[in-house]
């Protein structure tokens, strides 16, 4: 029993080992097969990826090749175009040179023809001169025979007539010299005035009756006019200024004789253009705001002016009236600038004579104060100025200076005389005041017209603001003696036909040039 059991156990062990071996072998075979399959799959995927990379590399290479080829073709094309342009320029330059060569050949031929014509004309002129000399000699002989006068006797008669004419001119010139000598008798006073003028110089503002407002574009003109013109009518009604909207690009012209109103309208219109909202209510608001700004500017101008001159304790109302003079002009001269200039000049003159400099400056600054409001109150600016100075309790010397600076009242102090002198200096210095532009231009044109009406005058120029006329004559027609006679004749016509202040200098210029070239 034990033997059978052992044998059975051994057989079972052997069978189990065999079954285990077979099972393990199958498992191993299966793993090997799976591993081979995985390996084959990996190899296949590697081949596919390698093929894809190969194709991608080929595509990139083709793209690079195409890009390089395109760039090369563009470069070649640009170079061809540049070469073509250079070739065209060379061809054009060659054509220009050919045309210039043809032109030069034509000019050379023309010059040769002209030279030949000039030679023939010179020969003809020489023949004519010879005939003229013979004719003049025969005419002189015939005149001597007819008039029963020799050449010397006729010459004596002509010289006597010229001598009489010159005697008249000499008498006139002598009288003018005497007048100038009398004017030179005040040399010392002129030296003092000249010193004062040299120590002070003021700028000058030209008179104008228009202002210009720049616009961002021409479409703004339609907005300024408004529907049926209501905006422009509102602005003109509120300011009293005419708005001129014409073909001037991006600009509107404001026209009016009251500078304060014109400045108010200018500020209001600039604010409206900047704001963009333009309608009657907004216009009224901006005009009122601009009026306040102008009033503030007037006040600040008065304060700054008194500070600049060094005047203290001036009444605030008088200071504001002083600021209004910034917007007044007289013959092209700004009244405030003129008053500042008179104040400085009066102070300098007072310092030279040992008078009160501060009081002289105060009187000079306020001498034209009436001009600030003379269009609002009846009476001359002198009367209004005296009334204002009295109202605000100014110094009696200041009041007398205002009253007497135009000679309406007798001056009772040295300072009043100095203020009148400074006023005359400021108004009379060259460039301070101007006449009407139209009259000024007409006078200059008449000067040149008179000068150019004489035979032998080549050109004339009115210079120094019409205080001198320079006449350039043709030297072959006007000799030196004729130049003096021409200057006298033009001077007489100017005196007879023109009205002008001061003197006009007549200068005749005769120039002869002889030019030779050494080779």
From Swiss-Prot:
Belongs to the RNase Y family. Endoribonuclease that initiates mRNA decay. Its EC number is 3.1.-.-. Keywords: Cell membrane, Endonuclease, Hydrolase, Membrane, Nuclease, RNA-binding, Transmembrane, Transmembrane helix. The keyword RNA-binding applies. It holds the Pfam family HD. This is Ribonuclease Y. The lineage of its organism: Bacteria, Bacillati, Bacillota, Bacilli, Bacillales. One of its GO terms (cellular component) is plasma membrane. One of its GO terms (biological process) is mRNA catabolic process. The chain crosses the membrane at residues 4-24. PROSITE patterns: HD, KH_TYPE_1. SMART domains: HDc, KH. Coiled coil: none annotated. It is an enzyme of class 3 (hydrolase). It is a single-pass membrane protein. GO terms for molecular function: RNA binding; RNA endonuclease activity.
């Amino acid at each position: 029993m034990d033997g059978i059991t052992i044998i059975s156990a051994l057989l079972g062990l052997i069978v189990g080992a065999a079954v285990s071996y077979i099972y393990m072998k199958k498992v191993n075979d299966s793993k090997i097969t799976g591993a081979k399959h995985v390996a084959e799959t990996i190899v296949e995927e590697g081949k596919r990826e390698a093929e894809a990379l190969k194709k991608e590399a080929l595509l990139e290479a083709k793209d690079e090749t195409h890009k390089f080829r395109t760039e090369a073709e563009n470069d070649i094309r640009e170079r061809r175009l540049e070469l073509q342009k250079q070739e065209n320029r060379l061809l054009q330059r060659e054509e220009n040179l050919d045309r210039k060569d043809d032109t030069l050949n034509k000019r050379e031929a023309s010059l040769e023809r002209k030279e030949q014509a000039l030679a023939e004309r010179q020969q003809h002129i020489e023949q004519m001169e010879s005939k003229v000399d013979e004719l003049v000699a025969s005419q002189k002989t015939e005149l001597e025979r007819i008039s029963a006068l020799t050449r010397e006797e006729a010459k004596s008669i002509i010289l006597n007539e010229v001598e009489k004419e010159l005697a008249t001119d000499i008498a006139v010139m002598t009288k003018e010299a005497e007048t100038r000598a009398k004017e030179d008798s005040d040399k010392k006073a002129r030296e003092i005035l000249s010193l004062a003028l040299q120590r002070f110089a003021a700028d000058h503002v030209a008179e104008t009756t228009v202002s210009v407002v720049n616009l961002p574009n021409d479409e703004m003109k339609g907005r300024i006019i408004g529907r049926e013109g209501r905006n422009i009518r509102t602005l003109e009604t509120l300011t009293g200024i005419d708005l001129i909207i014409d073909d001037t690009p991006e600009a509107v012209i404001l026209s009016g004789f009251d500078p304060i109103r014109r400045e108010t309208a200018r500020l209001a219109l600039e604010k409206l253009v900047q704001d963009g909202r333009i309608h009657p209510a907004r216009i009224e608001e901006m005009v009122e705001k601009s009026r306040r700004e102008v009033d503030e500017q007037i006040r600040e101008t008065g304060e700054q002016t008194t500070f600049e001159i060094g005047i203290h304790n001036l009444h605030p109302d008088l200071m504001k009236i002083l600021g209004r003079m910034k917007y007044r002009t007289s013959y092209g001269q700004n009244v405030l600038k003129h008053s500042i200039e008179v104040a400085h000049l009066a102070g300098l003159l007072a310092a030279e004579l040992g008078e009160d400099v501060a009081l002289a400056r105060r009187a000079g600054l306020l001498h034209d104060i009436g001009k600030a409001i003379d269009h609002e109150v009846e009476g001359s600016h002198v009367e209004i100025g005296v009334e204002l100075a009295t109202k605000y309790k100014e110094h009696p010397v200041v009041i007398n200076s205002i009253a007497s600076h135009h000679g309406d009242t007798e001056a009772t102090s040295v300072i009043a005389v100095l203020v009148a002198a400074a006023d005359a200096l400021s108004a009379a210095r060259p460039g301070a005041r101007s006449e009407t532009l139209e009259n000024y231009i007409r006078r200059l044109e008449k000067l040149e017209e008179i000068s150019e009406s004489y035979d032998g005058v080549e050109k004339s120029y009115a210079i120094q603001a019409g205080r001198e006329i320079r006449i350039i004559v043709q030297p072959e027609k006007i000799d030196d003696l004729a130049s003096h006679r021409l200057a006298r004749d033009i001077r007489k016509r100017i005196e007879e036909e023109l009205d002008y202040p001061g003197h006009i200098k007549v200068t005749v210029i005769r120039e002869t040039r002889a030019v030779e070239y050494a080779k």
